[in-house]
Swiss-Prot record:
Subcellular location: Cytoplasm
Subunit structure: Homodimer.
GO terms under cellular component: cytoplasm
Single GO term (MF): uroporphyrinogen decarboxylase activity
Location (main, coarse): cytoplasm
UniProt-recorded name of the protein: Uroporphyrinogen decarboxylase
Lineage per the UniProt record: Bacteria, Bacillati, Cyanobacteriota, Cyanophyceae, Nostocales
Name of the gene this protein is made from: hemE
InterPro entries reported in the protein's UniProt record: UROD/MetE-like_sf, Uroporphyrinogen_deCO2ase_HemE, Uroporphyrinogen_deCOase
Catalysed reactions, semicolon-separated: uroporphyrinogen III + 4 H(+) = coproporphyrinogen III + 4 CO2
Source organism per UniProt: Nostoc punctiforme (strain ATCC 29133 / PCC 73102)
Leader peptide range in chain numbering: none
Pathway(s) this gene product operates in, as recorded in its UniProt entry: Porphyrin-containing compound metabolism; protoporphyrin-IX biosynthesis; coproporphyrinogen-III from 5-aminolevulinate: step 4/4
Cited Gene3D superfamilies: 3.20.20.210
Amino acid sequence: MGVSSTTPHLLRAARGEVVDRPPVWMMRQAGRYMKAYRDLREKYPSFRDRSEIPDVAIEVSLQPWKAFQPDGVILFSDIVTPLPGLGIDMDIAEGKGPIIHSPLRTQEQIDRLHPLEPEAALPFIKTILQALRSEVGDKSTVLGFVGAPWTLAAYAVEGKGSKTYSIIKNMAFSDPTILHQLLTKLADAIAIYARYQIDSGAQVVQMFDSWAGQLSPQDYDTFALPYQQRVFQQVKQTHPDTPLILLVSGSAGVLERMAQSGADIVSVDWAVDMADARARLGKQVKVQGNLDPGVLFGSKQFIRDRILDTVRKAGNWGHILNLGHGVLPETPEENVAFFFETAKELNFAGVKN
């Protein structure tokens, strides 16, 4: 047990070890709800500057750590950050998200993409992750993250976020051959990027397939799942002991399929009751989630009740407490503090299943 005592709490739970309470972190825990972040944003208005200048990205990543001591500290970045390294020019517009300047619509454009060389294209990622590991030591788990092939393809083909995804669905259903070529190239690049993050200090990596919930289950099986598997298989070949998390927004219809991806942990959103998620996924699949981010607008008693409800339903093994998606920018900062305080005071012995 000597090794376990110095292994951070979240990493132990993610590996399936028995812990005394669920570890807790929050998606988008570094962000606009924090005054410290808003102050820094005034000095660095460009998202790419905030996420790619190492000293700034390190400071942002550590803001929630210094304020709340979550069990996970995640790299401050964006899922589209590696795209320029493949030859896909992009920017991140404040409040609007990624913008792809020349959306990929033709065979020629896809042929021109080149393999990702992270040491050349993304050296700042190594600097940031090494600094985070150095700062938190064994007191917290450092998380990296990547976008999934379908979701990055959706941005690259649409040119920006979309409500209908009509352009990429047009490609998927009328010219699937070139989309499969793009998805393959993206999967291989994402695997390289995830390995680079792990080699740079990430102890757990989460893959965001944010837009795969826009697919029917049969199309998920064609355009999302095989490429999630391709990424995870490549990462596991070289880093078999690094826990991998998969998140799909709006995943209620594909939850069981997510467990087939090769991920160690399935992130569950609030549209599925955690007890139902556990029943659907089976006892061997670890889970993350799944409070509605809006719960943090409620009273302290309401927040506490919802935390306890989720933890009871998830049970005392293989659960990482989190929101079902990112914390909302309008969330009162003191409620986030209360969420973390309450979660860290829990003990499975005192939470009746």
